[in-house]
Amino acid sequence: MIAYIHGKLLEATDKSCIILTPGGVGYELFLTLSAISTLPESGSDVTFYVHSVIREDAFDLYGFPCFDDREVFRTLISVDRLGPKKALAILSQFGPKDLQDLVFREDVKTLSIVPGIGPKSARQILWSLKDKMETLKSATVRSGACPVEGDRSEFLDALSGLRNLGYGDDEVRDFLKDIFDEEPDLDAGGAIRVALKKISQNK
């Protein structure tokens, strides 16, 4: 089972990337939106912790920039009827600390913004995660070691805000990445304002 990959970034889409290892083998990894948004240029060295999902008709690999994000992912998929695709969608919206806060507050409404998760499913997920809070807490304490550029929560809040304004992820993700690279301490509101200005200048 593949647990860790180091190689060069070959290609990337809005859902996955292909890593070329020194042995000449290319692996496709499914990533969270935050991981996709912080990928370097093609040809750059990258490293991911990996969770492998093996089925009769598929062999899917899910990549995470740090060990603790992978452990939170594994905690999520241990919830009954919560598969890897939905778990990845949750981590695309919420980091470990955000997720811990949702569980503590039993915030069904906020979790329900994740595509494919309605109020009933959100309530079941939050209830199930209450028994797994220690794992989430441990990951939250150590998650500062994750090599993610800028503040992930602010990035995702800005991305969500621009979606609400009618912009697609593909339209704004590169703008936001550049904005947070230049000003990593910027909050979501400031990033949205800068992004809107850049978008208008590029029309």
UniProtKB/Swiss-Prot annotation:
GO terms for biological process: DNA recombination; DNA repair. Coiled coil: none annotated. One of its GO terms (cellular component) is Holliday junction resolvase complex. Residues 145-155 are annotated as: Flexible linker. Keywords: Cytoplasm, DNA damage, DNA recombination, DNA repair, DNA-binding. Residues 66-144 are annotated as: Domain II. Residues 1-65 are annotated as: Domain I. Pfam families: HHH_5 (PF14520), RuvA_N (PF01330). The keyword DNA damage applies. Homotetramer. Forms an RuvA(8)-RuvB(12)-Holliday junction (HJ) complex. HJ DNA is sandwiched between 2 RuvA tetramers; dsDNA enters through RuvA and exits via RuvB. An RuvB hexamer assembles on each DNA strand where it exits the tetramer. Each RuvB hexamer is contacted by two RuvA subunits (via domain III) on 2 adjacent RuvB subunits; this complex drives branch migration. In the full resolvosome a probable DNA-RuvA(4)-RuvB(12)-RuvC(2) complex forms which resolves the HJ. This is Holliday junction branch migration complex subunit RuvA. It comes from Maridesulfovibrio salexigens (strain ATCC 14822 / DSM 2638 / NCIMB 8403 / VKM B-1763) (Desulfovibrio salexigens). The gene is ruvA.
